[in-house]
Structure formats: structure tokens, C-alpha cells
């Protein structure tokens, strides 16, 4: 006998908002209780219809998709209704938030591999179900994978999902599963090559690519670089946030030191997902049979090793908002500039190094790039293909260079003010060293413990202490002078 579906009220008065737990460009997510349902805790996604890029029909499609799908790894919508100029979507509350928030708050260098396998297998179950139902998700990433305190994992956010076919046989005797989508949707970091070049069309395998990028995101703590900000923007971001845009510096550097080791099965699985040719990528169903998932742990394992010590979703959101406010908002011009670069500098391909689980983007040549390469450049290009451990050039490091300007394999950059950049980076390095010294002084003062330091670090701290004392004396002198004048 079918179980009766709970009927949630379609009235805002029936819900009591507790706190905000997420925010986006056109939507906010709240923790709330449904009063008529014995104060059941729910999540409410409030979409501003005036701010949303999607039209009302698209939003209705999202909520319809969420309500019709039934799978333990899919986040269902209980109901949806309009409140003033907002669409409220009532959903289950996932107390640990998204995998993105978990990784960024507690595992910035990436999750342990045995935990990654659990999260990925649960997500893959959801993708397999979606594809069986004729749906592409089109925006698979850690931010759309939600986790509850019991370890349950649910794939969410169907704002850009699409039905690629009706799972029935047409009158001609062939299914319409061969239909391919051509509109661009999703987040640039996770976009499959065929989605970027959407004029060629794409299908279910685009989700498999995004799944592979998500695996890298969980392994390294962030997705691979997808666009190159200009030099000014890069330096500004380094100074303001210390969130380096040059992904390869952080990841390949740590790999060389041996800090991150990945099993052969994991590397092979990711490699299959990141095949350039979508026809060579396995289906979600086939991928579930890969050896990487064979000895996968249970949900209780991630509860014990990942979730038990985490802050809850509302605390993580509050902490993230405090961090954002502390570093200040980015300049609007910079954001517009970066958006334009994302638009105009889409990736044309990827170079995947399976040995250290790294993915480097390849960008199409710009108008300023020469259409013909010199023999020397062609030789260098051949060398680069033969050597997996080539020197990272200024282009790859995100210094705002064109592809042509960064061809030199020895790191030499043409048409680039190297001295100016070096000068700015040295100033930044010095500033960071002084900040580190100050932090060490504060830690020592609060804890009473003395860390083992190198001679250079001791000298830096000594200089910093003298500076602080000098600043204090200056303030005392100024106050004394002011008092004498007033007296």
C-alpha cells in the first residue's frame, strides 16, 4: 500500500523563520519550522522573482522536478508557493549544510580519500537515478551536495536541470534519448568541454565530467582554475583575501612535497570522468561498479570522521558572513571585469595529470594571439606534451597574460613588466611576514607557550616588537603634547 504523502501548508503564516543559513544572488535559504506539522524543522529557499535570472516557468520547472523525483539521495521539495514577489520552496533541512561549506570551513586542503568515496558514491546514486528518469542536473558541484547529521547525502538545486528526453519509445521505434541540449548552463569551474562549446550539443556525460571536477574539489579543497583574472585583480585578491587564484601553486606544490597521496583506483576513476571525448566517459551506472567504490565505507564512517566535530549549518553560515565582512566587498568594477573574462576566456580543453590528480585548463587563443606559431614555439609545444612536469608559466599562474605571451617553457614572460610584479610581490611577502610575526606574538601572549623558531623568525618578531613599542611611545608622546596644550 502506498504511503500517504504529507501535505505541507501553502501559507507563509504556517512557517516560523528561525535564521538565515544561505544566500545567493537571487535567493536566500532559511531554517524554519512548520507549525502545523508539530514544529517540524524545514529549509525554505526564498527566490526573489525580480532578481532571478530564470523566468517563473523555469523556477516552476525546478520545483516540479524536485517534487516528482523520489530517491533517498535526491532533495525533494515538500511544496512551493509565492509570498509577495518571492517564490518559497519548502524542503527538508540538512543540518550539516553543503559539502562545499564543510570542506571550506574544516578541510581546506581536501577530505580524506576514504571519506570522499562515501560522499561521491551517494552522489553518484543520485545522478544515476536522475539519468534513468531522463534528467540532466547540469550543475553538479560540492555546493549542491547537502549532508545531514546522520551522514545522509542529497543532491540539490535543480535550477538548471533539464529533461533531455521522455523515457518512452517514440512511434519511429527509437527513443529520443539521443537528443542533445545546446544551451549553456551550470557553473564555469565545473563545465564539461562540450558544454562550453555548446553548439556541438551535449548529453548525460556532461554530468559525469562535473562529477569528476567535484571529486577534485573534494580532494584538493577547491575546483581547478577555470579563468584567469588580470594582474591587478590577482594582486588585489591575494592582498584582500589570501585566496590565491593560481590554483596550481597550492595544489601541485603540495603534491610535490608528498602531502597528498591518492590511490590508483581514485586517480583512474577521476581520469575516466575527465575524458575529453564524452563518448569515452562511463555512464553513472557503470561508474558505480568501478573498483574505487568497491570497498566504500558506510555513512557512520563519515559521521565519526567528518561530521561529529563540525559546526552546524547556521554557525558555518554566520562564520562565513563574518569572514566576508572582515575582508570587505570586492570592487564592483573588478567583479564586472572578472565576469567579462569568464565570458571571453572560457576553457577550450583540459590537461589531466592522473599521476598527481591535477587538472590544468587550456584556453582558446585570443584575437591578439598570433595565428601562426614559429618553429621554436611549435617545438616547445611538442616538448610540453611529452613532459608532464613542465614549468608553470605566468599564463598558467593567472597573471593576466595571453597564451602567446606565456609560451616560453623556462618561465620567461614576453610583453610583461616582470620587475613591477616582482616588486609588488616582494612588498606583499614582507607584509605577510610582519603579519605572521604579529600573530605569533599574540599567540605566545595568550597561550604562554613559546614555539621553536628559526633565527630569521626570531629577528622578525624582535623587529615587530620594537615597532609596536615605538608606535606606543609615539602615541604616549602625542597624548602628552595634547594634554600640555590643553592644560
From Swiss-Prot:
Coiled coil spans: 450-477
Distribution of this protein across tissues and organs: Expressed in guard cells. Not detected in mesophyll cells.
Keywords, sorted A to Z: ATP-binding, Coiled coil, Cytoplasm, Kinase, Magnesium, Metal-binding, Nucleotide-binding, Phosphoprotein, Transferase
Superkingdom, natural source: Eukaryota
EC top class named in words: transferase
Domain (Protein kinase) ranges: 15-293
Cell location: Cytoplasm, Cytosol
Effect caused by changing residue 157 to N: Loss of activity
Residues covered by region (Disordered): 363-389
Protein name listed in UniProt: Serine/threonine-protein kinase BLUS1
Phenotype of null mutants: Defective in leaf temperature decreases and stomatal opening in response to blue light.
Entry comment on modification after translation: Phosphorylated at Ser-348 by both PHOT1 and PHOT2.
EC number from the UniProt entry: 2.7.11.1
Amino acid at each position: 500500500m502506498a504511503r500517504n504523502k504529507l501535505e505541507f501548508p501553502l501559507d507563509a503564516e504556517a512557517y516560523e523563520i528561525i535564521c538565515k543559513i544561505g544566500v545567493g544572488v537571487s535567493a536566500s535559504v532559511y531554517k524554519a519550522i512548520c507549525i502545523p506539522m508539530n514544529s517540524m524543522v524545514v529549509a525554505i529557499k526564498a527566490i526573489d522573482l525580480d532578481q532571478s535570472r530564470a523566468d517563473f516557468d523555469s523556477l516552476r520547472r525546478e520545483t516540479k522536478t524536485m517534487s516528482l523525483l523520489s530517491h533517498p539521495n535526491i532533495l525533494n521539495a515538500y511544496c512551493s508557493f509565492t509570498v509577495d514577489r518571492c517564490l518559497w520552496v519548502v524542503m527538508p533541512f540538512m543540518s550539516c549544510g553543503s559539502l562545499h561549506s564543510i570542506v571550506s570551513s574544516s578541510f581546506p586542503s581536501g577530505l580524506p580519500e576514504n571519506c570522499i568515496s562515501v560522499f561521491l558514491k551517494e552522489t553518484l546514486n543520485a545522478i544515476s537515478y536522475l539519468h534513468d528518469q531522463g534528467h540532466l542536473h547540469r550543475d553538479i558541484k560540492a555546493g549542491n551536495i547537502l549532508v545531514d547529521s546522520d551522514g545522509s547525502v542529497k543532491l540539490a538545486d535543480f535550477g538548471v536541470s533539464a529533461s533531455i528526453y521522455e523515457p518512452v519509445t517514440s512511434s519511429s521505434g527509437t527513443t529520443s534519448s539521443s537528443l542533445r541540449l545546446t544551451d549553456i548552463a551550470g557553473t564555469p569551474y565545473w563545465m564539461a568541454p562540450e558544454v562550453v562549446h555548446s553548439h556541438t550539443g551535449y548529453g548525460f556525460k556532461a554530468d559525469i565530467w562535473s562529477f569528476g571536477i567535484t571529486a577534485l574539489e573534494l580532494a584538493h579543497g577547491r575546483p581547478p582554475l577555470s579563468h584567469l583574472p588580470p594582474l591587478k585583480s590577482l594582486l588585489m585578491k591575494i592582498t584582500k583575501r589570501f585566496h590565491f587564484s593560481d590554483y596550481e601553486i597550492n595544489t601541485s606544490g603540495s603534491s610535490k612535497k608528498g602531502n597528498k597521496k591518492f590511490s590508483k583506483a581514485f586517480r583512474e576513476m577521476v581520469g575516466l570522468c575527465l575524458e575529453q571525448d564524452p563518448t569515452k566517459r562511463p555512464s553513472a551506472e557503470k561508474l558505480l561498479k568501478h573498483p574505487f567504490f568497491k570497498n566504500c565505507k558506510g555513512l557512520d564512517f563519515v559521521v565519526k570522521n567528518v561530521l561529529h566535530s563540525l559546526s552546524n549549518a547556521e554557525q558555518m553560515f554566520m562564520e562565513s558572513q563574518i569572514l566576508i565582512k572582515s575582508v570587505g566587498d570586492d570592487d564592483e568594477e573588478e567583479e564586472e571585469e572578472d565576469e567579462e573574462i569568464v565570458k571571453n576566456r572560457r576553457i577550450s580543453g583540459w590537461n589531466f595529470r592522473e599521476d598527481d590528480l591535477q587538472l590544468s585548463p587550456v584556453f582558446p587563443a585570443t584575437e591578439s594571439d598570433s595565428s601562426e606559431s614559429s618553429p621554436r614555439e611549435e617545438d616547445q609545444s611538442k616538448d610540453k606534451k611529452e613532459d608532464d612536469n613542465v614549468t608553470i608559466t605566468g599564463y598558467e599562474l593567472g597573471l593576466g597574460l595571453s597564451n602567446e605571451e606565456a609560451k616560453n617553457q623556462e618561465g620567461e614572460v614576453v610583453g610583461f613588466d616582470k620587475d613591477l610584479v616582482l616588486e609588488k610581490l616582494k612588498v606583499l611577502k614582507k607584509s605577510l611576514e610582519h603579519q605572521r610575526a604579529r600573530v605569533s606574538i599574540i599567540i605566545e601572549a595568550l597561550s604562554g607557550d613559546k614555539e621553536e623558531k628559526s633565527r630569521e623568525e626570531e629577528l622578525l618578531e624582535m623587529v615587530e616588537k620594537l615597532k609596536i613599542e615605538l608606535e606606543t611611545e609615539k602615541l604616549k608622546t602625542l597624548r602628552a603634547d595634547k594634554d600640555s596644550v590643553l592644560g
